[in-house]
Amino acid sequence: MDIYMSRYEEITQQLIFSPKTWLITGVAGFIGSNLLEKLLKLNQVVIGLDNFSTGHQYNLDEVKTLVSTEQWSRFCFIEGDIRDLTTCEQVMKGVDHVLHQAALGSVPRSIVDPITTNATNITGFLNILHAAKNAQVQSFTYAASSSTYGDHPALPKVEENIGNPLSPYAVTKYVNEIYAQVYARTYGFKTIGLRYFNVFGRRQDPNGAYAAVIPKWTAAMLKGDDVYINGDGETSRDFCYIDNVIQMNILSALAKDSAKDNIYNVAVGDRTTLNELSGYIYDELNLIHHIDKLSIKYREFRSGDVRHSQADVTKAIDLLKYRPNIKIREGLRLSMPWYVRFLKG
């Protein structure tokens, strides 16, 4: 028997029979909309908050087509901004579990616009954290980031060992962790921070200047455009499929008190180079949609990027019974049909 997945299955069954009320911030985004889909399919009541700065209405529209009419009726969407404390207080009424995903992501974006990144990721986080504490919610899980490891050279990355931040974005996500720790010590309000490592999957936006590498390259291949690799292509990352992230959010929300007031890596524990990744995407895409050729162009390394990233997920496995069951190749295979539909119509 797979004890790790049985814990996740046990929790999801428990939720079906005893529904809770959830708040998802950033609900119209990539991760937020996937959490929404999963929770509605578990017959949960969900309040969603988004200001559409990076999220999209079409993500919510898609979720609506994937759940029943009754399940969709349990969803209440509020268009609002986490930078407004009053909004955060209003959406928190009656909430059991908070999944805080709203943020301005992207290292390059934070270098171009550190002021807005700070306002959203630090002030916005503090507003949601404070409102949740005052509302006495049962759990508060927030999206942290692997960027917090900064220039620390050790591999794999262990939660306790971090270096100096390499971008304004990394600073904001680290400040989130510090605030969470202070709220636990000062107010007894315990949270769980999830350090995401290069999450990918369905509904990850391929458009825009700050698109992540997998959707950006997938779109380029489908259009017959060049694939641009920053540096020599030997930069490596621990790519984590969206279903692993959903699992960790739900495990965290229903975690025992002894596992709270903690930070956990959310990844697979593997390392894939950009050169390998481009080949994997090409292979998986070609299985369902013919690609004439793969044209790769190399350019300068990107400012603020770390050379290698790989997570140690032992802590999540031990304390939360996490099981990163979907690896990079399977995750890409599951993702490609969505991208073909989205980009080819």
Swiss-Prot record:
Optimum temperature is 37 degrees Celsius. Keywords: Carbohydrate metabolism, Isomerase, NAD, Nucleotide-binding. Substrate binds at residues 145-146, 196-198, 213-216, 228-230, 237, 302-305. NAD(+) binds at residues 26-31, 50-55, 81-82, 101-103, 120, 169, 173, 199. Its EC number is 5.1.3.7. Catalyzes the epimerization of UDP-N-acetylglucosamine (UDP-GlcNAc) to UDP-N-acetylgalactosamine (UDP-GalNAc). Has very low epimerase activity with UDP-Glc and UDP-Gal. Plays a role in the biosynthesis of 2-acetamino-2-deoxy-L-altruronic acid, a building block of the O-antigen in bacterial lipopolysaccharide (LPS). Pathway: Bacterial outer membrane biogenesis; LPS O-antigen biosynthesis. It is an enzyme of class 5 (isomerase). It comes from Plesiomonas shigelloides. Coiled coil: none annotated. One of its GO terms (biological process) is O antigen biosynthetic process. GO terms for molecular function: nucleotide binding; UDP-N-acetylglucosamine 4-epimerase activity. Binds 1 NAD(+) per subunit. Its cofactor is NAD(+). Homodimer. Belongs to the NAD(P)-dependent epimerase/dehydratase family. It catalyses: UDP-N-acetyl-alpha-D-glucosamine = UDP-N-acetyl-alpha-D-galactosamine. This is UDP-N-acetylglucosamine 4-epimerase. Optimum pH is 7.0-9.0. Pfam families: Epimerase (PF01370).
